[in-house]
């Protein structure tokens, strides 16, 4: 029994010299570990004479409880001391204003700036217009008749003002430009547009950039060169590009522009629906009626136009699969790209 008292005294002596949690762990292992002193004492209980065994077992358990208590107290003491040292080293002056959170540009902003920079470098000017637009500029002057489905309330946001709506594209900026300027015209029109769409790849509000060139020499080959050059600079690689015949009321002939899938490199994936191609733009030669509506003499001038969705290009550029992520105001989403 005297041996048990000596073990307790030894433990107290060791604890008095412990100065770190690492040293404490070594003491804990020595006395309470699976091969520690107290564990060995419990293993030897069967060697104790039967008349002393009960008392021996009781004393060993009391020793174990006391050891656990002493070690726990020492641990709390060391943690408190460690915290005090840390606080001393990290003293904070509460009178100093907190550091400002540093923001970063939104992927849409980055994509839009990238598009504008490329076209400025190609000699295009930037024109802007109102988001609440006259129905005449949004539809009529663009050769979109009254019976066209795009004018239905299921697709367009009309406002409580006769003859006005939330623009469905930035094409009205082209109309406004042709009404106030004489050819030659070479502009892009970036901005927000609104349509009644709401699914993983569409949003009721999104960003568009449209381009317009009007002069004496504009032709389809010229337009094709401009678009191919833009896509090459935007994606920083010489992608396969194809033009598919399409229909738009304001252009004739019209085409859809596809690029080789940037995700699977035309091997076929879910994003390109296993076709190897991704639609990125629409384009065409400006319909003569649109030019005439703006007072431009079609005997001397012709033009071409094109348009693209900024979110669509941003999703391809950054590998984003849900358009709604752009509008959730989550800084973690924004910061992962920059």
UniProtKB/Swiss-Prot annotation:
Full protein name: Phenylalanine--tRNA ligase alpha subunit
Key words, A-Z: Aminoacyl-tRNA synthetase, ATP-binding, Cytoplasm, Ligase, Magnesium, Metal-binding, Nucleotide-binding, Protein biosynthesis
Pfam families per the UniProt record, alphabetical: Phe_tRNA-synt_N, tRNA-synt_2d
Subunit structure: Tetramer of two alpha and two beta subunits.
GO biological-process terms attached to the record: phenylalanyl-tRNA aminoacylation
Family designation: Belongs to the class-II aminoacyl-tRNA synthetase family. Phe-tRNA synthetase alpha subunit type 1 subfamily.
Catalytic class of the enzyme: ligase
InterPro entries in UniProt: aa-tRNA-synth_II, aa-tRNA-synth_II/BPL/LPL, Phe-tRNA-synth_IIc_asu, Phe-tRNA_ligase_II_N, Phe_tRNA_ligase_alpha1_bac, Phenylalanyl-tRNA_Synthase, tRNA-bd_arm
Gene3D superfamilies linked: Bira Bifunctional Protein, Domain 2
Catalysed reactions, as listed in the record: tRNA(Phe) + L-phenylalanine + ATP = L-phenylalanyl-tRNA(Phe) + AMP + diphosphate + H(+)
Keyword Magnesium: yes
Annotated positions binding Mg(2+): 252
Compartments where found: Cytoplasm
Gene Ontology cellular component annotations, sorted alphabetically: cytoplasm
Ranges that cross the membrane: none
Keyword NADP annotated: no
The EC number(s) this enzyme carries: 6.1.1.20
Species this chain originates from: Aquifex aeolicus (strain VF5)
Main location: cytoplasm
Cofactor binding, note field: Binds 2 magnesium ions per tetramer.
One Gene Ontology molecular-function label: tRNA binding
Cofactor(s) of this protein: Mg(2+)
